[in-house]
Amino acid sequence: MCDTTITHFTIFGERCSGTHFLQHAICENFDIKYIKGEKHFFGNTQHYKDVISAARSPNELTGHENECMELYNKRPENVLAFAIVRDPVEWINSFYKIKHHVPKKNREPVERFISCEFYSIFDDCDKEIMGDRNWKTKERYRNIFELRKLKCQYILEELPKKY
């Protein structure tokens, strides 16, 4: 018989959607271990698996790639996956105030932030986060609205197939 005890949880949600709050609320109130996994940069699981399998050691991986590896090494039936989506107006206002992983050239003015090609970078080195591309085409998002639409679509249509 297969052990289906929930031992870990993970969260999928765009930046500024409440993932941090949800993580801490669960950890504070339940005896369960958190695995960051794909968290904000989700949908391109195969990209992360390819990078992980090509690495000779965990030292060659970014922190985020190591977090993904930790999640992938768990059996899905032992991981409770949460998905969180915030009201679109509140979300974009919050994201514009705190532009996590947004390239400097796309941060100002607001018109540029909402209308330019959207992609994510590692804040410490300005290198693009390839795992945060359009999960269907592997291209950058046309704009922040396409990012939101496709990530919501992934949460609704693809995530339930995995957990």
Q: What are these language model-derived features?
A:
Residues 1-112, 140-160:
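PAPS-dependent sulfotransferase catalytic domain
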Residues 102-137:
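A solvent-exposed, charged loop/short amphipathic helix patch at secondary-structure junctions
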